[in-house]
Regions:
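Amphipathic alpha-helical coiled-coil segments
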Residues: 12, 16-26, 30-33, 37-40, ...
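Short coil/loop "hinge" linkers that interrupt or connect long alpha-helical coiled-coils or helical hairpins
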Residues: 46-71
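Generic alpha-helical secondary structure signal
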Residues: 7-10, 70, 74
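Short acidic DE-rich linear segments
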Residues: 1-4, 110-117
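Short, charged, low-complexity amphipathic alpha-helix
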Residues: 1-16
Length: 117
């Protein structure tokens, strides 16, 4: 860091940057999971009116597996629930980190305004 900055202020700045990176990473994770949720919703909409015993294929990793509509709806519903949980947990973590970030930002502003080094 720059000359004349106290080790405490330097630590706060590093923590501030770290929190900023964590927030950015969480935002990206949340966005990615929400996109997955949209894909599941589209798939469920496509098959909603089909008979439960009709055959279909579902993607498992790089494989396509023969299934039926009923089983596929169940699996997609389970995935959707899992993604909903992941989004809620990530958003909760984001809010916690955001609070820490804002508190630290206020501390840094106060330190800079008071001329602390």
């Amino acid at each position: 860091m720059a000359k004349g900055i106290s080790p405490q202020l330097e630590d706060k700045i590093k923590r501030y940057q770290s929190l900023q990176q964590q927030m950015s990473s969480l935002q990206q994770q949340i966005q990615a999971v929400k996109l997955e949720q949209l894909d599941i919703d589209k798939a469920l909409k496509e098959i909603e009116d089909l008979p439960d015993d009709e055959e279909c294929y579902r993607s498992i990793g790089r494989l396509l597996v023969k299934s039926n509509i009923k089983e596929t709806k169940v699996k997609l519903g389970e995935q959707k629930d899992l993604y909903n949980t992941r989004v809620k947990l990530a958003e909760k973590s984001y809010e916690k980190i955001k609070k820490q970030f804002e508190d630290l930002e206020n501390e840094l502003k106060a330190a800079l305004e008071s001329g602390e080094k």
